[in-house]
Amino acid sequence: LPTGFYTDYDGHGTHVAGIAAGKTYGWAKNAKIYSIKIAGLQGSQDPNSGMPISDIFDIVKEWHKTKSADVLTGVKRPTVINMSWGYFSRYLSITGGNYRGTPWTGNSRVTAYGMTGRFDGAGYRHPVRVASVDADVDELIEAGVIVCIAAGNNYHKIANTSDPDYNNYYTNTFGQTKYYHRGSSPYSSN
């Protein structure tokens, strides 16, 4: 594989892998680690390298299905995939929305209702769901892969379907509706 398919230019993936399976302080010190980089999730130093996400899901699923049992124990070791990433969109201007069933216009209530994301210089970041990614995660779980997913770093409240904030949304100047408290792919709200 080209080095861009597994090189961590930002350091986040390496940091998380160290927590999970570092040789000195990791929780699973004897785990075997494989690094695969997702194309399109660039860190600040990344030259936009990596593999397409759909290919990665297929590779992990097939590898899990065909791997052999541990030679010492005779048991197939678990496959754990860490996905400490997520999808987001940016917005600059809000025209209105809905908070707990009450519609509003303008952007003054966004902050009051706790519906703003983290401003990163280019706009406010908002988590988004990607149905194809969520379906691929379901397939991994059904295949027996243990899936660990990021909770997020942007201080968004995540609500389940019975929470009064689950259907909160805002609309931006492009007419797009963004549900605020549903998390991002892969399944950060489940």
Please report, for each region that a protein language model flagged, where it lies by residue.
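Subtilisin-like serine protease catalytic core
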Residues: 1-55, 70-80, 89-93, 142-144
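Low-complexity, compositionally biased segments
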Residues: 11-13, 27, 49, 58-61, ...
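Sec-exported extracytoplasmic/periplasmic mature domains
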Residues: 21-25, 58-66, 86, 138-145, ...
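Short, low-complexity, polar/charged sequence segments that are solvent-exposed and flexible
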Residues: 37-39, 55-59, 100-103, 168
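A Trp-anchored, charged/polar loop motif used as the substrate-binding/catalytic surface
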Residues: 50-72, 127-133, 187
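Substrate-binding/specificity loop regions of serine endopeptidase catalytic domains
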Residues: 87-190
